Amino acid sequence: MLLAVLGSMGTLAQAQVSDAAPKFVERMADRALLERVRQGGYVLYLRHGTTDNSRADQVPLGDFKDCSRQRVLNEEGRQLAVQVGQFIRQARIPVSQVLHSPLCRARDTAQLAFAQQPGGLQQVDGLLYTANLTQAEKQPVLKVTRQWLSEPVSRGSNRVIVAHAPNMADLIGYFVHPEGTVVIVQPQGQGQFAYVASIPPKLWPSLLAP
């Protein structure tokens, strides 16, 4: 009897494991994908540059422009932001729109990476960092994040979103790492999008090599 009970418990445990959501699998971009991105129609979700982890965001943030209350880019992060922008231009990836979170680290990354962007940059307050929010507070932020990830992009151009790792983790279980990583997404409309691949900073040189 005891063996039968233990056996049924084991079967139940296996069923629970099999019913669990599949673990997210990160894929690295290759040159073939880069060629497709040059044709446009994608969203590039860029996690901000390297930050000073000795400074945590103060909650509530209050004024988004007050960088003294936020975790901000360090010098390495500022250089990384410039470098990622250069990589994107060297890859001849057309960018028609750059949106960024209102937090200083995302805003500064966008300004450093896309300083010469035609039409300028657009701050979207709804792209807030979600890690410090309650589940109820997260919902409108995730709705906005999903909206811009899923909104179709015209052929011949791409949309860039400069934001945070927790937002993507909340949406698809993918905590974007390291900082400065570009996540390539295929927007599908009506709130739907598909993860395609990632480009961490160290991958760019091999993608761009002759």
PLM features: residue spans?
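Short, surface-exposed amphipathic charged segments that create phosphate/polyanion-binding patches used
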Residues: 135-143
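Generic beta-sheet signal
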Residues: 41-43, 154-163
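Bacterial N-terminal signal peptides
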Residues: 1-8
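Active-site-proximal alpha-helix that buttresses catalytic centers in soluble enzyme cores
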Residues: 16-125, 130-133, 174-184, 188-210
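A short, acidic, amphipathic alpha-helical segment used as a generic capping/interface helix at domain edges
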Residues: 143-153
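Glycine-rich phosphate-binding loop signature in dinucleotide/nucleotide-binding domains
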Residues: 91-93, 152-156
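Histidine-centered catalytic micro-motifs
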Residues: 46-51, 161-168
